[in-house]
Amino acid sequence: MIPSTMTRFAAWSGVLAGLCIGLPGVVEVFTGETALTSLVLGVAPALAVPLLVVLHLRQSDTAGRLGAVGYAMNIIGLGLFGGAGFSLNVVLFHLDTPVVKELLSGPPRFALLGSAVVFAAGTILFGIAMARAGVHPRVPAVAYAVALPVLALAAPLPDSPFISAIHGVAGAAVAWLAVSLGARVPALSGR
């Protein structure tokens, strides 16, 4: 059994992660990328970790091997791509374009791409496992399996309305999954 405090923490953390993914995409349609939207997006992966753990724990008995493999790849990919995303959004954002191009012309480019591929593959597998297990709502599980990998693999592309829309869908899927966790947490009586 998962402690209710852990589930509540994961739910709140997941809602914040979803907002940190979705809101910058909406804002950037009007403003373009800013230091603030980049910072907010950069912290989203760290906020998503507790949610991912509890999503897995909730479905581990019914998700089988696919759920376990998907979770393992997703959590490792989240760590790798979360670090890469933080670097891109918070550190490299403030450097001049020629400097960034120089930095990303060599091995770091392959490391960033590799982290995106591991994250995308893990997210697809874990999203499929969620949809098949039926423990979590299917619509956000499928959106999770589709939107987050597209977002990761599109990270090197210039900002566009399409990228902003994907941010919105991905953020909504993460927040929806988080809210669905919170809806199932029994209230603690007398505490």
Language model region names:
Residues M1-R191:
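Hydrophobic, aromatic-enriched alpha-helical segments typical of multi-pass transmembrane helices
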